[in-house]
Amino acid sequence: MNLQPLKATFLTIAVISVLLFGCKKEGNSDENSMLWVGNSPTAIIKSSPYVVTLENKIQNKDKTFTWIWSVSNSKPGSGTPGSGTVQDLVSWGITLGSCANIDQIIYGSTSPDGIIWTNFQPKITKETSVEGFSKPVLMFNQGTKTDQKSYYKLVVLQKLGTTPDISAVYKSGSLTGSGAFTMSGFGCPTN
C-alpha cells in the first residue's frame, strides 16, 4: 500500500490547522483606539531583576496616545541569597525623560492580567528609598505575582518618540530590595 498520498494529506491538514488555529488576533480592548505603527516591544537595558517591556504605543481616535508596558519576574521565588530567585515586585516608577511632563499625561492604569484595568491619577514624587537615586518619578503601585506579566498604561496628549534610556526604579521585598535601571520610555515629540 502506497502511504505517500496519505502522508501528503495529513501534512496538508496539519499545516492548515496551524495556520487557522495557531494564530489568534487579540481583541481590541478599547474600541476608540487604533494600532499605531510605532509599536515595537523593547526590553530593559540594564540592572533590573524584572523584565520590563514596552509592549505597545497606540494612537487613539481622539488624538491621544496610549503607552503600555509589561513587567514580569523571570525568576520568581523567595529571593533568599544563593537561591537564584527574586521576590515579587511591589511597585516601580519611571522618570518622564527630558521632553515629557506630568501635564501631558491624562491618566494611568494598572492591570494584573491585561484585561481588568484600574485607573489612577499619575503624580510625580521624589524617590528616596533607592540608594543613589534622587530623580522625580511617576510610580506604578502594582507589582507582579510569580512569573505572570502585569501591565501598566499611560495615556498622553502628545505623540512622543521612544528613547531607550529612561531612568526607572523598582521596589521589592526585603531580600530582593530596591534599585534603579534603564528602560524604554518617553522621548521627545514627533510629527
Tell me the role of every PLM-derived stretch.
Residues 9-17:
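Sec-dependent N-terminal signal peptides
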Residues 24-26:
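Bacterial signal peptide processing site
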Residues 19-22:
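C-terminal motif of bacterial Sec signal peptides marking the signal peptidase cleavage site
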Residues 29-191:
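Extracellular or exported targeting regions of proteins
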Residues 2-10:
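Bacterial N-terminal signal peptides that target proteins for export
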